[in-house]
Amino acid sequence: MKKIIALILSAVTLSVSAQTDESDNGVVSLAGREGFSIKSKKGDFVFKPYTLIQTAAKYNWYDDEGLDKAYNQDNVMNSGFAIPYAILGFTGKVYDRISFNLCINAAASGGALLQQAWFDVKANNALSFRVGKFKTPYTHAYLTTLGETLLPIVPTSLTTNVIMPHVLNAVNPTIGTGFDLGVMAHGLVANNKFSYEAGIFNGTGAGVNSATKTLSDDIKGLPSLFYAGRIAVMPFGYMPTSQGNPNNLNDKKMIIALSANTNVEAQSESTNDTRAGFEFAYMVNKLYFATEFYYMHIGFTDRQKIDDTFDYWGGYAQAGYFVAPQWQVAARYDFMDRNATSKDGIINMPAFGFNYFIKDTNLKLQAMYQYMGRKGHDTQLDRDNDDLGLATHSVTVMLQYAF
């Protein structure tokens, strides 16, 4: 028995060291933390467990529109304490050719409980294939590592449902896409200054882990799936998927990216959705700046017998600056044409906040305030409808632990 144990210990070593490189699991913050990994003696096998826990205090105040005072509905709703993410997972690689990641979000339910489950096969730096459940290649805001975002809430223009004067077979879509099941080719070329992603996904989102799609009735023979692509230029080398890291305050990185996708027979075969986006992000020393602009076109499937089409757009600009080694101040201006270009008026969401990275504890404290404004609507009814379900005043304070 002692010989067997000795052989195992000689083949596998447990290393406990500071983790300064970015782990490609797309989930946890590596800022200022120490972790451990199990690694074979030759480095052919690496296994790393991780966790991310977020607890938030929220205050949301809503306008009177949409509230029924007869039922004593209050202006303050959806407030209190919440756990946005409680993630437990592990990631690793084998022979520097295959990497893998599996994690659950215990704060979610249904299919979203499984947040990620994928493996990545690397032919070379220019060509790899990822299969499973992972982030779709669309928008800098979503592709940022969870836990390394500038503010605790991603831009509202990506997460809020659009408005249209028709009833779909499912909820109205959002411009953002997020996690999905599929396969994707990706790679880095030109000394890591150019990247690409091209993938096919179910198009049903993070809450569905089964195959539910069919062939398109409108485009004969085409599977009713989600087709996505993204290209990016990084003039100063690979851009880390972070929006602020106190361990990386002496670097210079930039990314300019274009992305596009189409979801065939989305919303339970109600619509065909096409999206496009532009991304720009810049990090130099203590400063981080990013801006995005995105667009979505919705056309109805033939079976809906609706001739209307709708176009939506949105975007944001945000900046963060480390005023001290552990303190980052943040501001964002977010805007969206939620009721489609066929009607006048937009919503805009200015926000500001701060991040405090508590040294040597793996803790990160985030706080933000966001205001919901409306501008340019033709009628008061249009103005009232445009922010239904969205808080006029929103405050979030979140404490995060990552390991």
Language model segments and positions:
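Loop-centered beta-sheet repeat module
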Residues: 211-257
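N-terminal periplasmic/intermembrane-space "pro-region" immediately following the signal or transit peptide
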Residues: 4-54, 403
